[in-house]
Amino acid sequence: MEASQVEFEHPRKAFGWAARDSSGLLSPFNFSRRDIGEEDVALEVLYCGICHTDLHMAKNDFGNSIYPYVPGHEVIGIVAEVGSKVEKYKVGDKVGVGYFVESCRSCQNCIDNLENYCPKHILTQGDKHIDGTTTYGGYSDSMVVDEHFVTRIPEGLPLDGCGSSSLCWGYSHSPLKYYGLDKPGLHVGVVGLGGLGHMVAKFAKTHGLKITVISTSPPTKKEEAIKNLGADSFLVSRDPDQMEAPKETLDGIIDTVSADHSIVPLIGLLKSHGKLVLIGAIEKPLELPPFPLILGRKLVGGTLVGGLKETQEMIDFSPKHNVKPEIEVVPMDYVNIAMQRLAKADVKYRFVIDVANTLKPTS
């Protein structure tokens, strides 16, 4: 069920766009941010990527949205102020904020730099902070974040592209690394030709993998996938003949699709001992046939976003290997149209909001 809250007044005035109910429509929203603490950085938001999770949460597809809801967890900003005990950043630094802004810092996951799996992690948007107030995301002019949950953006990286990649870098690479699908010569399928999918394909090629893109997109997208992403082959998932021919040829599959779809045909593409890794947040329960898994010792697993250490490593890795997202930059007042287009997969490959230049305060 959806929930609404009475807005708590913090010291810092802020402005952004928010959904007020499960219609998912966003509109201008005046709110407030907490004051800067000793280990906090305050940042001016420059860019923010639009993720499919933003769309799901705006519409309460997961049943736990809190309104007003300010989306945005692919945030790029410039540090405007630092707390008295901040050590990693200074005013003027370019930084990123991803999917979460707090964790317990004492559980085994946190100790192992896997804060993303901490049972007490706090999401960047639509969650409850330690003080009980709602967290608001990056579709806004400013944020206040503990320095531990901020990543550094190296000089020379295009900041608009980083607005998508602050999440995608860790999210796209983590499943390849954790499931051992980053070894040269392996054949890996990538399901979905969207924001995450195209980055998975790009990272995979840096490891010397053979890549098959699997998509509902028409065959005309084949040349695009091969030319732009370096894919070795392309399958239209709605074509039974195409899905039948390469059965049991893939060492692994990374499924990035958030829309409801069957994974049964994907399991059939896996070799014995193959791994299907889900990173798209599908709303409905999956059909999971046991016999193909048992007889082929196949694995179905999943991953969340990368931890902070891994995400920073991938941010630093990307410019050295020319890995960068392909984006469409849009103004803030285009966000509802962008959401509609995203729902129809009508974007190549990720929307990024130019917050700094297009977010206009209301009186």
Curated annotation (Swiss-Prot):
EC class name: oxidoreductase
Residue sites binding Zn(2+) 1 per the record: 51, 73, 168
Keywords, sorted A to Z: Metal-binding, NAD, Oxidoreductase, Zinc
Gene3D superfamilies: Medium-chain alcohol dehydrogenases, catalytic domain (3.90.180.10), NAD(P)-binding Rossmann-like Domain (3.40.50.720)
Pfam families assigned to the protein according to its UniProt record, in alphabetical order: ADH_N, ADH_zinc_N
InterPro entries according to UniProt: ADH-like_C, ADH-like_N, ADH_Zn_CS, CAD-like, GroES-like_sf, NAD(P)-bd_dom_sf, PKS_ER
A single GO molecular function term of this UniProt record: zinc ion binding
Family in the record: Belongs to the zinc-containing alcohol dehydrogenase family.
PANTHER family (alphabetical): ALDEHYDE REDUCTASE
Protein name: Probable mannitol dehydrogenase 3
Organism for this UniProt entry: Stylosanthes humilis (Townsville stylo)
